[in-house]
């Protein structure tokens, strides 16, 4: 029961950061999306980060233009997830296709460059 309550608190804390179709990262959902052949976009953020907010705004718009992709976000202070993706900085953007990482950027907030990366992943 204690583990369940900890899990619920953890889920609620991180789910508040999801925007639009973006989902707080979970390994199970990430693996499922990849196994279904979807292009997966993963972004990292941290509270009070202006470049993170800028990138999230671009991704929020991109979700409408690239609806066939799956979007996940995680707080970069979550060391387990950060290590899994080898992410050391907030505003890191990753794109996966065919079970492989095909794009990585750090600090990119320019709509044109993010859209180019998304288009090249289709």
Model-derived regions, located:
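Short acidic active-site motifs
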Residues: 29-30, 79-81
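Sec-dependent N-terminal signal peptides
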Residues: 4-13
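Non-catalytic, surface beta->alpha helical segment in thiol-disulfide oxidoreductase systems
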Residues: 97-122
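Typically the conserved alpha-helix immediately C-terminal to a functionally engaged Cys/Sec
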Residues: 52-65
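Short active-site neighborhood of thiol/selenol oxidoreductases, capturing the structured segment around
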Residues: 35-47
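N-terminal leader/targeting and pre-domain segments
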Residues: 10, 18-37, 120
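Structural micro-motif
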Residues: 85-94
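Thiol-based oxidoreductase modules, predominantly thioredoxin-like and allied folds used
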Residues: 44, 67-80
């Amino acid at each position: 029961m204690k583990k369940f309550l900890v899990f619920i608190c953890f889920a609620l804390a991180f789910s508040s950061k999801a925007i639009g179709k973006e989902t707080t990262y979970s390994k199970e959902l990430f693996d499922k999306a990849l196994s279904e052949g979807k292009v997966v976009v993963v972004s990292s953020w941290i509270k009070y980060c202006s470049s993170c907010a800028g990138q999230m705004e671009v991704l929020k718009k991109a979700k409408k233009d690239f609806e066939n992709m799956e979007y996940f976000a995680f707080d970069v202070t979550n060391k387990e997830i950060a290590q899994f993706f080898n992410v050391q900085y907030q505003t890191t953007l990753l794109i996966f296709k065919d079970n492989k990482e095909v794009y990585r950027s750090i600090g990119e907030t320019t709509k044109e460059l993010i859209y180019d990366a998304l288009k090249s992943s289709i």
